[in-house]
């Protein structure tokens, strides 16, 4: 019928328009503008330039003097760079090399041809290496390139190769104080020993004597407590900056106090001993193989399906209780192989320091324990109930981290093992477990603010106190389960 309307679209229209402009360009037809750059003249079509570049679109459509000009002089870019950009606007392809990318990027930024800018950035980041890193940094900075993801990828390379780069004079020359500070504050530098970061800072300072005025500020981003004492003595205290910088001397004194305060280290939270780690790490500490063999490996999940093996205490313990205090790991009790070839409950306690990857034997618990529960409140690690091969008990004791000693506190209400604990709001919650009669639904809360007197804190005391309080029971009896507190 006459009133019916049907629409049709061409699948080749866009291609034919582009091909049409290319044909006119190659034949030199209908060219209506000449662009003069340096001593070279480039003829083109205003319409095509305006569709490809916001710079030219504004030039030819807004109230600008160039709108009606046939010849336009452009300054601030090279003929070589613009020739590649113009070819891209007509043909959609561009060839890049380290010899030409500088001029092409300059021209693309000038005419606001973002697609070519992205190509240049991708090319540069694919070619980046130690030898040209400083040059690429300078290039991106010179043209204020702000393409999404480019700076992040550049920084990722810099952080991954920070120490090797800091041995190169060209990189040292270009790296600014502000950039250096931001890199030193970044936890992605964790792959480098802290002493190497300090030596890198020294190299930057020595490169230009005028930089020494920044010493006190920069040095605060070095974490001296992550170094070994020998490194501080031999490489920090002997440097010329130790004499020059009051802040450096203060940082060294603080680190030496930290090294000497062995037992207090887990409670000394400060920037200087904060582990450089860009994300939380997963570690597996010890375990069973079958029913009798002990797996003594400590494994760190480096990346998916890749585990790193760490050193561990040279004692054949199996299923230990574990407590974490400021990224120090305490392994407590469990069982160990005795001289009779059998496993017996252990009272041993070990502390792992991931900063130095070292283990330290701490004071033993007052009694051997296995299948017990632990919790950390303030400066104390609490060990609740548990058993040996011969008996189950309800004694509760706590470890004073600062004093490296154990003392008994108010006992758990009943003999129990196989229970679990977690801390919430400075209170220790104990759930489930096995009593003399059955698996338990019990939930009991320990409030350290209500602890009894020293005389009441005996291994077998039956003095009733207000320290332990029963809460609503669980719906199901549980034992050998796991429990965590959320938003504690």
From Swiss-Prot:
Signal peptide: none annotated. One of its GO terms (biological process) is negative regulation of double-strand break repair via homologous recombination. Keywords: Kelch repeat, Nucleus, Repeat, Ubl conjugation pathway. It comes from the Eukaryota. The keyword Nucleus applies. Transmembrane segments: none annotated. Homodimer. Interacts with CUL3. Substrate-specific adapter for CUL3 E3 ubiquitin-protein ligase complex. This is Kelch-like protein 15. The gene is KLHL15.
């Amino acid at each position: 019928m006459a009133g019916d309307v049907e629409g049709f679209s061409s699948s080749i229209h866009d291609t034919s328009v582009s091909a049409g402009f290319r044909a006119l360009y190659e034949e030199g037809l209908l060219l209506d503008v000449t662009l003069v750059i340096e001593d070279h003249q480039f003829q083109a079509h205003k319409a095509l330039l305006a569709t490809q570049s916001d710079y030219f679109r504004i030039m030819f459509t807004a109230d600008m003097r160039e709108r009606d000009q046939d010849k336009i002089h452009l300054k601030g870019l090279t003929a070589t760079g613009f020739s590649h950009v113009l070819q891209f606007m007509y043909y959609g392809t561009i060839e890049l090399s380290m010899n030409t990318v500088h001029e092409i990027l300059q021209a693309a930024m000038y005419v606001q041809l973002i697609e070519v800018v992205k190509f240049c950035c991708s090319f540069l980041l694919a070619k980046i290496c130690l030898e040209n890193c400083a040059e690429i940094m300078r290039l991106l900075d010179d043209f204020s390139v702000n393409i999404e993801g480019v700076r992040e990828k550049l920084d990722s390379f810099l952080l991954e190769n920070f120490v090797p780069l800091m041995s190169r004079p060209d990189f040292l020359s270009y790296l600014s104080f502000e950039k250096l500070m931001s890199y030193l504050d970044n936890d992605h530098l964790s792959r480098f020993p802290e002493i190497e970061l300090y030596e890198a800072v020294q190299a930057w300072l020595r490169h230009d004597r005028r930089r020494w005025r920044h010493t006190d500020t920069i040095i605060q981003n070095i974490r001296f407590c992550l170094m070994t004492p020998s490194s501080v003595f031999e490489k920090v205290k002997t440097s010329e900056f130790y004499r020059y910088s009051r802040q450096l001397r203060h940082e060294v004194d603080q680190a030496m106090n930290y090294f000497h305060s062995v037992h207090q280290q887990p409670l000394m939270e400060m920037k200087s001993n904060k582990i450089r780690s860009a994300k939380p790490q997963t570690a597996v500490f010890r375990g069973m193989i079958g029913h009798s063999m002990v797996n003594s490996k400590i494994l760190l999940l480096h990346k998916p399906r890749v585990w790193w093996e760490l050193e561990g205490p040279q004692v054949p313990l199996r299923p230990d209780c574990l407590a974490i205090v400021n990224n120090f790991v305490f392994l407590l009790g469990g069982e160990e192989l005795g001289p009779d070839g059998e496993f017996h409950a252990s009272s041993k306690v070990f502390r792992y320091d991931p900063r130095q990857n070292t283990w330290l034997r701490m004071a033993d618990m007052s009694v051997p324990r296995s299948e017990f529960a632990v919790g950390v409140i303030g400066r104390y690690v609490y060990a609740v109930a548990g058993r040996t091969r011969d008996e189950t008990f309800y004694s509760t004791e706590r470890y004073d981290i600062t004093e490296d000693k154990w003392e008994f506190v108010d006992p758990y209400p009943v003999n129990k093992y196989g229970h679990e604990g977690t801390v919430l709001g400075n209170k220790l919650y104990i759930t489930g477990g096995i009593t003399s009669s059955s698996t338990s639904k019990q939930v009991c809360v320990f409030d350290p603010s209500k602890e009894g007197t020293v005389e009441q804190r005996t291994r077998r005391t039956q003095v009733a106190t207000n320290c332990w309080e029963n809460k609503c029971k669980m719906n199901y009896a549980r034992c050998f389960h796991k429990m965590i507190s959320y938003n504690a």
